[in-house]
Amino acid sequence: RSGERKNVVMNGMAAGLTDADIDELADWYAGQPWVIADNGNPNLVEEGLNRAGYCHACHGMKGYPVAKDWPILAGQSALYLDNQLQAFKSGTRYHPHMVNVVKDLEPSAMTALASYYTQLNGAAAPQ
């Protein structure tokens, strides 16, 4: 709601929500069953793993972030992850760290990274 994260759809939707509304939505989403993603193309997964070294610094070796406010990548939809990387590169989504991460990534590298992270098990966070 602060407007720090720019998204035309979500900024408009969140503007009218109270803190209680947001808490209720978060609880509802947290209670939904995890859908196991397709393991994807093995060649793309391997390429993604080879390119993910820089990603591991923030998102962890298994796609679980080192900071609680950063997103879990493990098990996310490949299409969603690919779209988010493209949005960071085009400037339609902004995060100060991600701008530098994606600036030299080609679309094929984004697809490979998305394929790698989608096949990781996102059903339960590591203990």
Residue map of PLM features:
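Sequence/structural segment immediately N-terminal to covalent heme-attachment motifs in c-type
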Residues: 37-64, 76-77
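Axial heme c-ligation environment in periplasmic c-type cytochrome domains
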Residues: 1-22, 29-32, 37-42, 67-72, ...
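Generic structural signal for short, flexible, solvent-exposed coil/loop and linker residues
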Residues: 2, 6, 47, 59-62, ...
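Hydrophobic packing within well-folded, soluble alpha/beta domains
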Residues: 25, 55-58, 113
